[in-house]
Every structure is written in structure tokens, then in C-alpha cells.
């Protein structure tokens, strides 16, 4: 199975009939429970799926009013909206579950793609307990998929790799440390990555998509030597050149294309 990606703004033209998915993250403002005004004006109904990278508002789950506001924009109650929770979303997990009918971590299958949504706030960036059991079960049993996509807020794969760790302060909103919003020391490379490589070697393309960027950079790509793809997109409210990540999926042939797109361009569609 061939796999294409976009780099340097060059998008390989996909077939006419494709599905479109949007990854957007860190839409919060600094002093209220609204989202960035440009992000608010995007026509999200134009996309077949929404992948939310977390930190939607300043305290997203604090009250029903804010959750209803978020639901009116992103339709978080829809099975086609996948949400990896960030630290600013984490006030009341029970309220989020009431709106989404999901745990903070879950898996699903859509049109040949297996999705695994991780909760990187739980256990300070470590995937353990029931969440690790879910991870193991999905990766041990995955078969009829062209892609495995992991959605997560924190860039947990930046810790434990020398070259990636050097980039943390210029890429991730949260620095390396012990705080709740930090990239915490974790065992991604020991406990998760080897199984991702096994899946990749089966011919199933593995993509990890993080959401905790936007303050220092709006886009990030890194391909490991095992061809596991790391991506991240996020915005900072009120700044220029905010970007989201658009995926175009040729379901028939199993191709997945992506590009980073300026938010302003999405409001014109």
C-alpha cells in the first residue's frame, strides 16, 4: 500500500471522491471560555470528521454552558468528532462524558482507518492501566486497516529521543517538567513505540497526531527511521499564521494526504 504525505506546501492531487478530515487544536483564549474568533467562524460541517487536539477553551468542562457552546461549534456529541483532551479541558471529566458518551480514551474504525484517542493528561503523560490495556488490545488485533492514527494532546514522543527533546522548548506549548501541562517523563519509546513499529511493518501506516502546539510554532512533522509519522498542529488565539491540519482520504485506494492550512482560508470555504 502506497502512502503519501505533503511537505513544503506541495499536495499530491487526490482523486475527486475523497473524505476530508480536520485536525484543530489549542483554540482557547486566555481569559474566557470562548474560542479563537477565526476558529469559531470555520464551517466545520464541510468536513467528514473533526479531530480535536485539546485545550478548546480556558476551562472547557467547568460548566454545562461552556460545554454546550463547544458542542454547538464542534458537535462533540457526534461519533465523527474525536477529541483528545488537554489540560484546559480537564476540569470535570464526568461532564465531558455526559456530552460525548465516551471515556477520555477510546478507539474506533472509519473507512479503513483505526483511530486510537489517548488521554495524555492521565498519569502525567504515561499510558498505563486500563488505557494501556486498550492500547495493547488495539495494536495486537489490528488487521483490516490501511492506517492507524493516534490522536493525543501532549507530544509525549518528544521525551526520550535525544534529537526530539532538543526541540521541546521551540515546539511544544508545555515544556519538559513535572507540571500538569508539561511534557512529563514517560515511557512512550519503551512501552508504545515498539508496538507501533510492529504495526507499521505489517503495512499499516502509523500516524501520531498531537495537539499541544501553537504558541511557538503552528505545525510540526517528524518521520522516524521506522517510518512512523509524528504530526502536530495548533493555534494561538489572536496571532497571525494560525494553521489547522487537513487530511484528504481516498477511501477506495486507501491513500491519505495531508497539508497544513491557514485558518483564514478555511473560513472562506
Where are these regions (language model features)?
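Bacterial Sec-dependent N-terminal signal peptides
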Residues: 1-13, 196, 200
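Active-site glycine-centered loops adjacent to acidic/histidine catalytic or metal-binding residues
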Residues: 26, 54-55, 86-87, 153, ...
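A solvent-exposed, charged loop/short amphipathic helix patch at secondary-structure junctions
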Residues: 49, 162-187
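Extended active-site neighborhood of metal-dependent phosphoesterases/phosphodiesterases
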Residues: 64-147, 171-179, 191-207, 213-256
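Short acidic, glycine-rich surface-loop motifs adjacent to enzyme active sites
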Residues: 142-166
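Acidic, His/Gly-rich catalytic cores of divalent-metal-dependent hydrolytic chemistry
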Residues: 252-269
Amino acid at each position: 500500500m502506497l502512502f503519501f504525505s505533503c511537505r513544503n506546501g506541495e499536495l499530491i492531487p487526490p482523486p475527486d471522491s475523497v473524505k476530508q478530515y480536520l485536525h484543530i487544536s489549542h483554540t482557547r483564549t486566555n481569559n474566557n471560555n470562548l474560542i479563537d474568533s477565526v476558529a469559531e467562524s470555520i464551517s466545520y460541517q464541510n468536513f467528514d470528521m473533526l479531530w480535536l487536539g485539546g485545550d478548546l477553551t480556558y476551562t472547557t468542562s467547568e460548566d454545562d454552558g461552556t460545554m454546550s457552546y463547544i458542542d454547538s461549534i464542534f458537535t462533540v456529541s457526534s461519533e465523527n468528532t474525536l477529541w483528545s483532551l488537554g489540560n484546559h479541558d480537564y476540569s470535570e471529566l464526568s461532564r465531558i462524558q455526559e456530552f460525548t458518551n465516551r471515556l477520555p480514551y477510546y478507539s474506533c474504525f472509519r473507512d479503513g482507518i483505526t483511530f486510537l484517542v489517548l488521554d495524555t493528561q492521565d498519569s502525567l503523560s504515561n499510558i498505563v492501566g486500563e488505557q494501556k490495556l486498550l492500547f495493547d488490545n488495539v495494536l495486537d488485533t489490528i488487521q483490516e486497516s490501511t492506517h492507524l492514527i493516534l490522536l493525543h494532546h501532549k507530544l509525549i514522543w518528544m521525551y526520550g529521543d535525544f534529537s526530539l527533546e532538543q526541540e521541546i522548548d521551540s515546539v511544544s506549548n508545555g515544556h519538559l517538567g513535572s507540571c500538569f501541562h508539561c511534557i512529563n517523563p514517560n515511557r512512550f519509546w519503551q512501552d508504545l513505540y515498539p508496538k507501533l513499529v510492529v504495526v507499521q511493518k505489517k503495512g499499516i501506516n502509523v500516524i501520531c497526531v498531537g495537539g499541544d502546539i501553537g504558541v511557538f510554532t503552528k505545525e510540526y512533522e517528524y518521520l522516524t527511521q521506522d517510518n512512523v509519522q509524528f504530526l502536530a498542529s495548533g493555534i494561538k488565539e489572536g496571532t497571525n499564521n494560525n494553521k489547522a491540519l487537513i487530511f484528504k482520504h481516498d477511501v477506495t485506494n486507501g491513500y491519505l494526504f495531508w497539508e497544513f492550512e491557514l485558518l483564514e482560508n478555511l473560513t472562506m470555504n
